[in-house]
């Protein structure tokens, strides 16, 4: 989705400088003039005074620590055929273009190929990609606060965002991957919502600490976790592109332009039998060198696609899309007719818009809730859950291709593994600066195993097979540093539920219990916030719907 009717993807100059997202920075580069873009013409950087261009801000996750993809980059003089071939070979749906000075000058997406190339019958082998690319794409600096960048992408309704560091494009941010991560964690949080709420109450009772604080929104969620249906976010009179099996790919792309859509529903006697998307056209038509004038939809469509019903819960629809790893989901009415086609960005944008305009919820509160949502979704390290980021060894080396690989390190993260009560081993990456963060990661995997009235002691196994207590942030930091010093790449954790626990020398039982109580309380609060925001979007949609 290059644009989807949102703000045009113009370059955004860095606030306070004439800086344009480029492969290499130039001293004389300009960020461009004004214009009627809905977004200001500047890079997506934080407006906060605490911004640092040289490093990451303390306590806030930055774009650099999101799930980034390597950027496939080619010269803008490359032919469309070669560009499409490389995109198909790498199985990516976005390509960055550079000018003769190796400066970033454009972006090309699968939707551009369908609507600007195939629909207009351009000669793939003779037309340079510069003729159809979106010029001067929006970019984001690597040290931009991640929450702000993601919310800007949702508001702008575009998926792909080049990431710039020290004037060079280092990666590409695909919001769909970030949203799928959030969806997976939302799903886990929603399933554990009641257990988390009970755990919060239990910890408050045992430790005499108020975790949630004066939060009316949280109290509302405890009383009623409402999951609205897809019908609440589908606009009236939605136009759906429907085609037949015998229509040609060329004809369908022309209709995509007319409907401003990147997906066509394939129908037989008003029944859905397939779906054809712009990515299908790239991967199955152009890459196979099939003639779009004569190739029929039936030959290249995805048959019998997953679908949803108008009364399906939003969370369930997101779960289907996450499991299937696809972007478009047809929505059917009770008669089986397709009434809409949704995607993750559509759903998230609708939820955010509704949250921001709900009666009784001011913009500051709505923005705060959305920030908590993103913060919760990003609470774990980006390499968790089967990181899809490719390694350098997996890179496809193509001649004359400029390829930017992801080579980020995460100096404040470390690998951990932990066995649950069912004998299953959990492996994950986690920040090491705070014991609360580690406990949060444990709760998100083993929350059902842990009773708030019998909180375990966290221990790790050292090189002598001794179990050593982790009672504070300093303990955690020391354990990780020691593990690194002896060449270990991870720590094995244990949860000790016995009444008589070993303690570190120099730390009293009272001090340790105090530190532990604070860490467990803060961790439960973090996990509860994730459940709250996942369900909270549903509550806000419900409140808005009933206030009209």
Curated annotation (Swiss-Prot):
It holds the Pfam family CBS. Residues 63-126, 133-190, 233-293, 301-358 form the CBS domain. Coiled coil: none annotated. The chain crosses the membrane at residues 521-543. Gene3D superfamilies: CBS-domain (3.10.580.10), Phosphatidylinositol 3-kinase Catalytic Subunit, Chain A, domain 1 (3.10.20.90). Residues 37-56 have a biased composition (Low complexity). This is CBS domain-containing protein CBSCBSPB4. It comes from Arabidopsis thaliana (Mouse-ear cress). The gene is CBSCBSPB4.
């Amino acid at each position: 989705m290059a644009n989807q009717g949102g703000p045009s993807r113009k370059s955004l100059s860095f606030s306070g400088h004439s800086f344009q997202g480029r492969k290499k920075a130039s001293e004389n580069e300009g960020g461009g003039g004004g214009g009627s873009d809905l977004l200001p013409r500047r890079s997506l950087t934080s407006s906060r005074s605490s911004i640092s261009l040289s490093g990451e801000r303390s306590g806030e996750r930055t774009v650099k620590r999101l799930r980034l993809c390597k950027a496939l980059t080619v010269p803008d003089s490359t032919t469309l055929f070669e560009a499409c071939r490389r995109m198909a070979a790498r199985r990516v749906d976005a390509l960055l273009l550079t000018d003769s000075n190796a400066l970033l000058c454009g972006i090309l997406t699968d939707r551009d190929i369908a609507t600007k190339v195939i629909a207009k019958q351009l000669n793939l082998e003779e037309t340079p990609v510069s003729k159809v690319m979106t010029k001067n794409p929006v970019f984001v600096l690597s040290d931009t606060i991640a929450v702000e960048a993601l919310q800007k992408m949702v508001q702008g309704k575009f998926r792909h965002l080049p990431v710039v560091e020290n004037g060079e494009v280092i990666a590409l941010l695909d919001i769909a991957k970030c949203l799928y991560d959030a969806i997976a964690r939302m799903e886990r949080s929603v399933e554990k919502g009641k257990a988390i709420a009970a755990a919060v109450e239990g910890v408050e009772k045992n430790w005499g600490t108020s975790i949630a604080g004066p939060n009316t929104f949280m109290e509302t969620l405890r009383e009623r976790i409402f999951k609205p249906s897809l019908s609440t976010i589908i606009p009236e009179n939605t136009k759906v592109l429907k085609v037949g099996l015998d229509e040609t790919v060329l004809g369908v792309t022309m209709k995509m332009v007319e409907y401003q859509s990147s997906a066509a529903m394939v129908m037989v006697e008003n029944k859905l039998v397939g779906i054809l998307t712009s990515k299908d056209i790239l991967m199955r038509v152009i890459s196979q060198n099939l003639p779009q004038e004569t190739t029929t939809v039936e030959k290249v469509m995805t048959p019998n696609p997953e679908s949803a019903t108008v009364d399906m819960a939003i969370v369930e629809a997101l779960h289907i899309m996450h499991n299937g790893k696809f972007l478009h989901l047809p929505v059917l009415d009770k008669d089986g007719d397709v009434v809409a086609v949704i995607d993750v960005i559509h759903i998230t944008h609708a939820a955010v818009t509704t949250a921001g305009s709900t009666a009784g919820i001011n913009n500051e509160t709505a923005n705060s809730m959305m920030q908590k949502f993103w913060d919760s979704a990003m609470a774990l390290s980006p390499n968790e859950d089967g990181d899809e980021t490719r390694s350098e060894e997996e890179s496809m080396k193509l001649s004359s291709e400029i390829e930017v690989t992801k080579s980020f390190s995460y100096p404040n993260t470390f690998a951990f593994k932990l066995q649950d009560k069912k004998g299953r081993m959990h492996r994950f990456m986690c920040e090491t600066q705070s014991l609360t963060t580690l406990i949060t990661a444990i709760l998100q995997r083993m929350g059902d195993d842990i009773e708030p009235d019998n909180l375990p002691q966290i221990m790790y196994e050292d090189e002598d097979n001794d179990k050593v207590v982790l009672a504070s942030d300093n303990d955690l930091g020391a354990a990780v540093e020691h593990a690194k010093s002896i060449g270990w790449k991870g720590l094995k954790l244990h949860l000790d539920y016995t009444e008589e626990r070993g303690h570190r020398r120099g730390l009293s039982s009272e001090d340790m219990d105090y530190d532990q109580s604070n860490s467990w309380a803060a961790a439960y609060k973090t996990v509860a916030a994730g459940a709250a925001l996942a369900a909270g979007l549903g509550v806000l949609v419900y409140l808005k719907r009933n206030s009209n």
